[in-house]
Amino acid sequence: MGSTSSLYAAIDLGSNSFHMLVVREVAGSIQTLTRIKRKVRLAAGLNSENALSNEAMERGWQCLRLFAERLQDIPPSQIRVVATATLRLAVNAGDFIAKAQEILGCPVQVISGEEEARLIYQGVAHTTGGADQRLVVDIGGASTELVTGTGAQTTSLFSLSMGCVTWLERYFADRNLGQENFDAAEKAAREVLRPVADELRYHGWKVCVGASGTVQALQEIMMAQGMDERITLEKLQQLKQRAIHCGRLEELEIDGLTLERALVFPSGLAILIAIFTELNIQCMTLAGGALREGLVYGMLHLAVEQDIRSRTLRNIQRRFMIDIDQAQRVAKVAANFFDQVENEWYLEAISRDLLISACQLHEIGLSVDFKQAPQHAAYLVRNLDLPGFTPAQKKLLATLLLNQTNPVDLSSLHQQNAVPPRVAEQLCRLLRLAIIFASRRRDDLVPEMTLQANHELLTLTLPQGWLTQHPLGKEIIAQESQWQSYVHWPLEVH
């Protein structure tokens, strides 16, 4: 077993799907080796007496036989299997679990709703960047977890008896996507939420994070439709109107919505609209991980880092042997430029963070080859697992690195949706200039500079005589000024 002792597995027997995650511990973080998900729809097999049908149990056992094959290489002490809402509820859960344990060869633990909520929060805390004080929402098949917390500590935990499968069976049983069904589903969800809303609001949050298939589906829809990745009530209402327009569940077609997710999408959407309305949520983003990640990090006993993005960047720099001193040098110059123009350009703090992150990784392409290094950098960043960064933020970083030098590909900056296109252009300009002025790879050779913005015009003022004393530098800046002018970015250098 010595060679496999760094492997860990987490299995989540959910009400809608069964999931298995297999990871390897690498430098205080986890590297995903296997993810398997199977739609089992266990909750749909509950009858009015809360007994699971034989068919539903057989679907579950069949899935576990697939999982069992992969578990043979992992020490039992490094496997955790948990069951959630449906198996908490089912009167014959014991029958299902006995056979499940026999198939898997390890214990299956039915966890309480509060424990599920705590584990979901831990998974989010380990994998999701942004503000420390958060509200986490996870809409499962038969339960919905709502958790507030700061850093690694939860402040309130709730597990509510509503989910996308149970709401589908209850409010969309006729498969009709009419306004009446949505109204009934939302009203019922708000009634379930009302008793806990005050306590959640009392603890408060600076950022709201969604950690479920419904939120994942929304993210995929918004990416496919070129919207930014922030989920708002307005966008949810638009999608509801689109669903109503489709008329029936089997005719539901929305750009970016997969067939696999379509069945429980309207019911999940109704619950999410109720949560947004009842808790007055302004905006939600997708979490980097949830229950399974919480289980894995719990087995590894890893502390929650204050800044997940920084940990990710450090790990990538080590792995690809990036020159950390140079990355810091470029970041320092870029930060200085950013601070000088942020008021004129109305830039937000998150834009500064993303610019600095791009600086930290800008030489990653050299690990492949100097030729086409920006393209290699963009490919690597687009395809690496970057905990703490959302999919849209990864796309922005890749786009910035693609455009760090040479003529600018304006269309790529407009295709990302982490920030408005104009902001992506502005960050790109600052990154390119920072790379140029830190290119000598010595702190004492970075000149004192001022950068002023007047609408799109950038005016860079260098020390007197600098351009005369640095003919190569002068040539590089003249070329850069020309490249920026091609895309209507005026740059004056004095």
Curated annotation (Swiss-Prot):
Pathway noted in the entry: Purine metabolism; ppGpp biosynthesis; ppGpp from GTP: step 2/2
Catalyzed reaction equations: guanosine 3'-diphosphate 5'-triphosphate + H2O = guanosine 3',5'-bis(diphosphate) + phosphate + H(+)
List the SUPFAM superfamilies hit by this protein, alphabetically: Actin-like ATPase domain (SSF53067), HD-domain/PDEase-like (SSF109604)
- Which EC numbers characterise this protein's activity in its record? 3.6.1.40
One GO biological process term is:
guanosine tetraphosphate biosynthetic process
Q: Name one GO molecular function term.
A: guanosine-5'-triphosphate,3'-diphosphate diphosphatase activity
User: What keywords are annotated for this sequence in UniProt?
Assistant: Hydrolase
- InterPro entries according to UniProt: ATPase_NBD, GppA/Ppx_hydrolase, Guo-5TP_3DP_PyrP, Ppx_GppA_C, Ppx_GppA_N, PyroPPase_GppA_Ppx
Tell me its family.
Belongs to the GppA/Ppx family. GppA subfamily.
What name does this protein carry? Guanosine-5'-triphosphate,3'-diphosphate pyrophosphatase
**What is the species listed in this Swiss-Prot or TrEMBL entry?**
Escherichia coli (strain 55989 / EAEC)
Which gene is the coding source of this polypeptide chain? gppA
